[in-house]
């Protein structure tokens, strides 16, 4: 084996052979002769004229330059993207005035979300663009993640908000001084019914997926109120809520979410909520909640509470959750009655719901005006029942047996009771969309001054005509908000089956839209004071009358 010193000598000799004119001493070469002076280290300068090396170096240089150019191009693209995001962020935060782009994200931001046993419906992402340069139009752009993009001139104008997907666009036009309705006389609320049918023939000359809706005006609901800022024609929607109810909502709803859900109950019946959602999509074939009304709720919350977009995102999820809850309750046959209120008077009513609730007769002229729209409804077959009355002292008194007459109101209509000058009670119903009713029972007896509550079971499916109550100890409960009339008379001859009017002296109990009452004593006193012709043989429990 060669030693380390021998190896160093061999390397030194090899280097000297390569450059005989310029002897080179390696850095680690050690001179053994102490008398010989050490050689100075020389810098080796190689002048190589080999063209292959030059070509190789040139290719390396070109590769590095191309890589740098690619990095520079990516940086420029990133800078352009940042600028675009900055501009969109400025639009969202209202830093620019034309146009103002406000995102209204509803439901899951990624569309459909799936768990182990549940599949939520696809909730659209909604963007509202207020463009003052296009006749003060409000453009509500609804993104459908399940569809492909379709070319459209209007879509191309407003497609910068969420690129790469098809947008179902709803153009909401603010009515001018002489343009409170559409050309065909259709009101804003009626025009909004075509929103769920985007792409249908109602949107000609606009696009296959664009529908023009005119914001309604005060003439649509003269007795109603504004949702949103009534002084801003772009941020308000007229609704059928009467001023007293709106004042009640504003007073009792301390949070934006509570107000949104309360407004939802006032504006959409629970039956409508059960078969609808925000997107109008899903495996159950649900319909879409009126976007104009939802936009009104949004305007109202922004105006009253100054909520942020994240708050509105959460509220939209709560609205969808409320609709799913109503759907599940309907599938189980449970009550859809609203516990917080029971008055649902149509906007065309000529008198208030409080007068209707207690049977107070309206003025004769108003009654005559409402009669052409009212259809008399005959009572069903009589059935003997026992009526229990709870006195002021809390004692339960059994009224002698009488006849109970039950009339189910057809779906989509509302019951009203009026009293003529001769004291006859007329039972009729007035149409109102999206309502249905049922009579439920609780097999729980009355005990003391309270009534035990249980989940009611439906006695017959919706759509039946009459119901015969079985004799026994079944507790019959007309749920709060139920538009079903049950009249009990002590006179068996006063059947009223043929539609003949029942005398007030024969009526012991009547059911009509009842306000929530928790004090039975006050309820009985109020009923006796306002209706002296009717015996206060009733018990009010959470807005319902319990009889046996």
UniProtKB/Swiss-Prot annotation:
Residues 160-350 are annotated as: Interaction with CUX1 and HDAC1. Pfam families: BEN. The keyword Cytoplasm applies. Residues 343-354 have a biased composition (Low complexity). Changing residue 345 to A: Reduces phosphorylation and abolishes cytoplasmic localization. One of its GO terms (biological process) is positive regulation of DNA-templated transcription. It comes from the Eukaryota. There is a cross-link at residue 141 (Glycyl lysine isopeptide (Lys-Gly) (interchain with G-Cter in SUMO2)). Residues 174-206, 335-368 are annotated as: Disordered. The modification Phosphothreonine is found at residues 345, 360. The modification N6-acetyllysine is found at residue 283. Residues 197-206 have a biased composition (Polar residues). The record marks 347 as: Required for TP53 activation. GO terms for cellular component: cytoplasm; nuclear speck; nucleus. MAPK1/MAPK3-mediated phosphorylation at Thr-345 and Thr-360 results in export to the cytoplasm. Keywords: Acetylation, Cell cycle, Chromatin regulator, Coiled coil, Cytoplasm, Developmental protein, DNA-binding, Isopeptide bond, Nucleus, Phosphoprotein, Repressor, RNA-binding, Transcription, Transcription regulation, Ubl conjugation. Its main location: nucleus. Residues 65-98 form a coiled coil. Signal peptide: none annotated. GO terms for molecular function: DNA binding. It is found in: Nucleus; Nucleus speckle; Cytoplasm. Gene3D superfamilies: BEN domain. Belongs to the BANP/SMAR1 family. Part of a corepressor complex containing BANP, HDAC1, SIN3A, SIN3B, RBL1 and RBL2. Forms a trimeric complex in the nucleus consisting of BANP, HDAC6 and KHDRBS1/SAM68; HDAC6 keeps KHDRBS1 in a deacetylated state which inhibits the inclusion of CD44 alternate exons. The complex is disrupted by MAPK1/MAPK3-mediated phosphorylation of BANP which results in BANP export to the cytoplasm. This facilitates acetylation of KHDRBS1 and CD44 variant exon inclusion. Interacts with TP53. Interacts with CUX1/CDP. Interacts with HDAC1. Controls V(D)J recombination during T-cell development by repressing T-cell receptor (TCR) beta enhancer function. Binds to scaffold/matrix attachment region beta (S/MARbeta), an ATC-rich DNA sequence located upstream of the TCR beta enhancer. Represses cyclin D1 transcription by recruiting HDAC1 to its promoter, thereby diminishing H3K9ac, H3S10ph and H4K8ac levels. Promotes TP53 activation, which causes cell cycle arrest and inhibits tumor growth. Plays a role in the regulation of alternative splicing. This is Protein BANP. It comes from Mus musculus.
């Amino acid at each position: 084996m060669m030693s380390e010193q021998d190896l160093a000598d061999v390397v030194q000799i090899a280097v000297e052979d390569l450059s005989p004119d310029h002897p080179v001493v390696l850095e680690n070469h050690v001179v053994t002769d102490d008398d010989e002076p050490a050689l100075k280290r020389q810098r080796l300068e190689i002048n190589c004229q080999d063209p292959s090396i030059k070509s190789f170096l040139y290719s390396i240089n070109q590769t590095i330059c191309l890589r740098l150019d690619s990095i520079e191009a990516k940086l420029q693209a990133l800078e352009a993207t940042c600028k675009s995001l900055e501009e969109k962020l400025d639009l969202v935060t209202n830093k620019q005035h034309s146009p103002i782009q406000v995102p209204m994200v509803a439901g899951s931001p990624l569309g459909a979300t799936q768990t182990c046993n549940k599949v939520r419906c696809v909730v659209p992402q909604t963007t509202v663009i207020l463009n003052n340069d296009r006749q003060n139009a409000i453009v509500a752009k609804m993104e459908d993640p399940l569809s492909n993009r379709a070319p459209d001139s209007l879509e191309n104008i407003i497609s910068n908000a969420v690129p790469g997907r098809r947008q179902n666009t709803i153009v909401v036009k603010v009515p001018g001084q002489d343009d409170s309705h559409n050309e065909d006389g259709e009101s804003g609320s009626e025009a909004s019914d075509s929103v769920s049918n985007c792409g249908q023939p109602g949107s000609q000359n606009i696009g296959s997926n664009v529908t023009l809706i005119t914001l309604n005006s005060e003439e649509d609901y003269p007795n109603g109120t504004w949702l949103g800022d009534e002084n801003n024609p772009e941020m308000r929607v007229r609704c059928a809520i009467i001023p007293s109810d709106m004042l009640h909502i504003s007073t009792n709803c301390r949070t934006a979410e509570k107000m949104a859900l309360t407004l939802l109950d006032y504006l959409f019946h629970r039956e409508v909520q059960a078969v609808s959602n925000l997107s109008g999509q899903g495996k159950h074939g649900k319909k879409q909640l009126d976007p104009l009304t939802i936009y009104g709720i949004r305007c109202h919350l922004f105006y009253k509470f100054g909520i942020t977009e994240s708050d509105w995102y959460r509220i939209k999820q709560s609205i969808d959750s409320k609709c799913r809850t109503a759907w599940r309750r309907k599938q189980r046959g449970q009550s859809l009655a609203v516990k917080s209120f029971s008055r649902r008077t149509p906007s065309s009513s000529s008198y208030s719901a409080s007068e209707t609730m207690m049977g107070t007769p309206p003025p004769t002229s108003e009654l005559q005006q409402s009669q052409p729209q009212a259809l008399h409804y005959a009572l069903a077959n009589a059935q003997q029942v026992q009526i229990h009355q709870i006195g002021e002292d809390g004692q339960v008194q059994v009224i002698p047996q009488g006849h109970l007459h039950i009339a189910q109101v057809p779906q989509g209509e509302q019951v009203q009771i009026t009293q003529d000058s001769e004291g006859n009670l007329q039972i009729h119903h007035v149409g109102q969309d999206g309502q249905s009713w049922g009579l439920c029972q609780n097999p729980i007896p009355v005990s003391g001054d309270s009534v035990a509550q249980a989940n009611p079971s439906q006695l017959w499916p919706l759509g039946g005509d009459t119901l015969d109550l079985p004799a026994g100890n079944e507790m019959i409960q007309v749920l709060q908000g139920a538009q079903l009339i049950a009249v009990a008379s002590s006179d068996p001859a006063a059947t009223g089956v043929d539609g003949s009017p029942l005398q007030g002296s024969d009526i012991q109990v009547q059911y009509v839209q009842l306000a929530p009452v928790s004090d039975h004593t006050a309820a009985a006193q109020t009923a006796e004071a306002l209706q002296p012709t009717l015996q206060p043989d009733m018990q009010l429990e959470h807005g319902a009358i319990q009889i046996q």
